[in-house]
């Protein structure tokens, strides 16, 4: 898992409002890397399996919302490989690569969402280009 932690560090450095994030397997939701210590990403194994399955049909997600780390989020926006969730002053961006799902939970006003999205999508592009 340790090699993947560098990607976690890159995302959190690019968008300091990212409080917790993880890289999980797209097929089964297994955790490849995640934030630790005070900002540990704490989604359960079952929750991650359910979450990665949302990418099978993202068009259905806005009607149902999404759950991550025990929190239910409204999902105002999805794209082919992106899910954006929002709840009060927190939110998440999740993107799918060829073999992974990147999930970044952030805190802050709406203005920080663009920075978080850019950090997550930049890592998505990098991993896709690297074959992941």
UniProtKB/Swiss-Prot annotation:
Keyword Transferase (UniProt): no
SUPFAM superfamilies in the record: Profilin (actin-binding protein)
Listed Gene3D superfamilies: Dynein light chain 2a, cytoplasmic
InterPro entries noted in UniProt: PFN, PFN_euk, PFN_sf, Profilin_CS
Molecular function in Gene Ontology: actin monomer binding
Tissue: Expressed in the nerve ring during late embryonic stages. In adults, expression is seen in the neurons, vulva and somatic gonad.
A GO CC term attached to the entry: cytoskeleton
UniProt cross-references to PANTHER family, sorted A to Z: PROFILIN, PROFILIN-1
A UniProt-annotated Pfam family: Profilin
Protein's recorded name: Profilin-1
Main localization (coarse): cytoplasm
Taxonomy, superkingdom: Eukaryota
The keyword Cytoplasm appears for this protein: yes
Family according to the record: Belongs to the profilin family.
Assembly with partners or alone: Occurs in many kinds of cells as a complex with monomeric actin in a 1:1 ratio.
UniProt function note: Binds to actin and affects the structure of the cytoskeleton. At high concentrations, profilin prevents the polymerization of actin, whereas it enhances it at low concentrations. By binding to PIP2, it inhibits the formation of IP3 and DG. Also binds to poly(L-proline) and phosphatidylinositol 4,5-bisphosphate micelles.
Subcellular location, record wording: Cytoplasm, Cytoskeleton
Entry's Gene Ontology BP terms: regulation of cellular component organization
Swiss-Prot/TrEMBL keywords: Actin-binding, Cytoplasm, Cytoskeleton
């Amino acid at each position: 898992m340790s090699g993947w932690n560098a990607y976690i560090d890159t995302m959190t450095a690019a968008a300091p409002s990212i409080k917790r994030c993880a890289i999980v397997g797209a097929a089964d939701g297994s955790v490849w890397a995640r934030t630790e210590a005070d900002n540990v990403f704490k989604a359960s194994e079952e929750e991650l399996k359910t979450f990665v399955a949302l990418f099978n049909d993202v068009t259905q997600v806005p009607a149902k919302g999404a759950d991550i780390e025990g929190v239910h989020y409204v999902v105002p926006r999805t794209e082919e490989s992106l899910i954006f969730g929002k709840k009060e002053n927190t939110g998440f961006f999740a993107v799918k690569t060829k073999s992974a799902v990147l999930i970044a939970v952030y805190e802050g006003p709406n203005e920080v969402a663009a920075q978080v999205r850019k950090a997550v999508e930049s890592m998505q592009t990098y991993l896709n280009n690297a074959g992941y």
